[in-house]
């Protein structure tokens, strides 16, 4: 779970920016979008194959 502790002299905008950065690094939004609809086994295999190809070329 992502947490951000706001300091006394810290404004809420910077804390919100830190929170958004942590959430995007953790991949929470991508996971939510992926789980929004049922993914068939074929779609899952295709997604994983694309991820493997991307990882191999980095």
From Swiss-Prot:
Family per similarity comment: Belongs to the bacterial ribosomal protein bS21 family.
Protein name: Small ribosomal subunit protein bS21
Superkingdom of this protein's organism: Bacteria
Keywords: Ribonucleoprotein, Ribosomal protein
Molecular-function annotations in GO: structural constituent of ribosome
Gene: rpsU
InterPro entries: Ribosomal_bS21, Ribosomal_bS21_CS, Ribosomal_bS21_sf
GO biological process: translation
Signal peptide: none
GO cellular component: ribonucleoprotein complex; ribosome
Pfam families associated with the record: Ribosomal_S21 (PF01165)
Organism: Picosynechococcus sp. (strain ATCC 27264 / PCC 7002 / PR-6) (Agmenellum quadruplicatum)
């Amino acid at each position: 779970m992502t947490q951000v502790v706001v300091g006394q002299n810290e404004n809420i905008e910077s804390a919100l920016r830190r929170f958004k950065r942590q959430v995007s690094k953790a991949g929470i939004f991508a996971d939510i979008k992926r789980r929004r609809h049922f993914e068939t086994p074929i779609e899952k295999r295709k997604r994983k194959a694309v991820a493997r190809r991307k990882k191999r070329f980095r």
